[in-house]
Structures are given as structure tokens and as C-alpha cells.
Amino acid sequence: MEKVIQILNQKQIHQKLERMAYQILEDNSDETEIFVAGIVRGGYILATRLVEILNKLSTQTFHLVRIELDKTSTRLKAETDRPLSDFENKTILIVEDVLNTGKTLTYGLGVFLNLPIKKIRTLTLVDRLHRLYPVVSDFTGLEISTVRHQYITVVLDEEGREDGVFLE
């Protein structure tokens, strides 16, 4: 039986999000509005929390967006809960909980690739550094080198009570 190790607790997750929020504001100081697009499920919960933090720190406008993916499809299947025309010439921040091979983040980016976008940035809570796809996280909460058979689990309670990041 594999040992489960908690690598981030609720307080640490919040601290990471707050630090990344300041980095986002610094990177986007000239923007009036930013679309924060969370990849369902964990990325969307993180995006929701991030928007709450950003709204406390800045007068800029932050729009929360949900990205739904079908990673089992042989063709890219991803969609947002807003019309794609809303994103034209705008700044988008794509949020994911764990960056492992890069497939999920690549699919999330794919939604916006045929649009005239001003700027796209990516944020991940945990980066495992096991890329199979050519993507990077612009804002990262924690980088951790793991072996392939290890697994990172991000537990995010919708109310933020029992959060944690675990290594198995």
C-alpha cells in the first residue's frame, strides 16, 4: 500500500493563490478586464477562489469562465460557458489544478487558438514537470518532481473546508 503524504494544506493553498494573484496583477497592470477560465472541476474551483482574491486586491474587472473538456475524444472537444466572441482581443488566464503531461492544459488552450486574443496566460496550483505536450505554467503554486507512478490528488471542497494536495 502506497503512503499518502499531504504536501499542501488549506492554508498553504490559499497562500499560493494569494501570491499568484499578486503576480497576475503585476503581469496585467495595464489591463482593465481579465477572463479567468477554470478547467472543470479542480481548475474551476481554483479560478473561483482566485477571482475572489483578485476582486479584493484590484478594481480591475475579472470574469469567471468555465471550460469543459472531453479528454477521451480523439478530436479536441472543449467549450466554455460564454460565447467565444466575448474573448476577442481580451486577456485570458487559464486555470488548472495539476499540470502533469500537459494534455488538459493544451485542450483548454485549444478553445481560444482560433480567436484574436490579446494575451493568454496559464496558472496551475501544482506542476509535476512531466510534460508530453509543449505547454508551460506562467504562474505556479508548487513545482514538484515526482516519479511517473506517483499520483498527485488535489482535494478542493466547494466551501473550502477540507482542502489539500496529496502525493501517493
PLM features: residue spans?
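Active-site-facing substrate-recognition patch
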Residues: 1-32
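Residue-level signature of catalytic and energy-coupling elements of molecular machines
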Residues: 13, 36, 120
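Short, glycine/charge-rich flexible loops or terminal/linker lids adjacent to PRPP-binding catalytic cores
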Residues: 17, 48, 52-91, 103-107, ...
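Short, well-ordered alpha-helices that flank and scaffold nucleotide-derived cofactor binding pockets
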Residues: 22, 26, 48, 52, ...
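Short glycine-rich phosphate-binding loop at a beta-alpha junction
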Residues: 30-40
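Residues at the starts of beta-strands that form the adenosine-phosphate
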Residues: 33, 61-63, 91, 119-122
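Internal catalytic or translocation cores that form aromatic/hydrophobic pockets or channels
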Residues: 90-119
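PRPP-dependent phosphoribosyltransferase catalytic core
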Residues: 110-168
